Amino acid sequence: DVFYLGGTKCGALFGEAVVITNDDLKLDFRYCIKQHGGMLAKGRLLGEQFLALLDGEDGGETSLYFTMARHANEQALHIRAAFEAKGCKVLHDSPTNQQFFALPDEWYAKLAERYAMTHMDKPDKHHTAVRICTSWATKDETVEQLIEDVNAL
């Protein structure tokens, strides 16, 4: 019925696009946003970013947004495969640019010195739950270096 598209992972300056596919939910949605402080002045300019990002043929599959999102997702899944091959526990089955792992604390300590990852939780006294995100700007060399470092653990 409703989903959103994040803009920054695909090169937008900021913002998210809420997409409502259920016509019944569209009624007065604009007023709800305004009443709850979610509508920015000149906010339609944010929409221009999404129009440019989503411009493409084939229902958008060839658009800049999908091209960049595909890159981010593929990089994340490449990282996930390396962690899984090393025996690391995947916390959530995510097909997106965000991957969640329970790392042994010593792995986390070593990797956190070199890589940005979100510390999420301590699922037990020997592991740290982390989130690793990729984006449109994630370089192959960075992913390969991370994989080398994981394999060296």
Where are these regions (language model features)?
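Hydrophobic alpha-helical segments
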Residues: 15, 20, 57, 118, ...
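Active-site C-terminal subdomain of aminotransferase-like
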Residues: 1-98
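Conserved C-terminal alpha-helix-loop-beta "cap" of PLP-dependent enzymes
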Residues: 77-78, 82-151
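Short, basic, helix/turn surface patches
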Residues: 1-10, 33, 117-123, 148-153
